[in-house]
Design a protein with these regions (language model features):
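Alpha-helical interface subdomain recognition
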Residues: 4-8, 12-155
Length: 155
């Protein structure tokens, strides 16, 4: 449990770990979505060309890749900080905020890339979208993460 009067410190440390672990599951889903969208964009044809050749589709996939790689590095940084016994509160909050909101955007992009079929239950994107919205709520809402970051900036 820890020493008396140090509960907030223990809670803060455990929340950083919790956020990092939860975000890893978001990251895994983002990666799977990216891979499925790339495969689909290479094989689905419209007007005689793979849809990945159209800028609108390619740009969405590029944005998904950028969000995924940024999220991955942010999660690794939080894990490294905690492993080194360094304060990770603000980094964990920034990571939670960025990854959860990026997860929602990637889900919306995946649905858009797949068109009408992206919203059907058979492809799982609609379920992943519902799950992604939850990631902005649990373990501290996006607004709470912004408050933690602002406090870390001494605002």
């Amino acid at each position: 449990m820890g020493r008396e009067g140090r509960g907030a410190e223990v809670f803060s440390c455990s929340m950083a770990w919790e956020r990092a672990c939860i975000l890893a599951t978001c990251l895994g889903t983002m990666r799977r979505q990216l891979e499925r969208c790339i495969d689909y964009a290479r094989t689905r044809k419209q007007f005689g060309h793979p849809i990945g050749k159209f800028q609108a589709v390619a740009n969405r996939i590029v944005d998904m890749k950028l969000r995924y790689e940024t999220a991955r590095l942010m999660i690794y940084k939080v894990g490294w900080l905690m492993q080194m016994d360094k304060s990770a509160d603000m980094d964990a909050a920034m990571t939670k905020l960025y990854v959860s909101e990026s997860f929602v955007k990637s889900c919306l992009d995946a649905i858009q890339i797949h068109g009408g079929s992206g919203f059907m239950t058979e492809l799982e994107f609609e379920r992943e979208l519902r799950d992604s919205v939850g990631s902005t709520l649990y373990s501290g809402t996006s607004e709470i993460q912004r408050n933690i970051i602002a406090r870390g900036l001494r605002l």
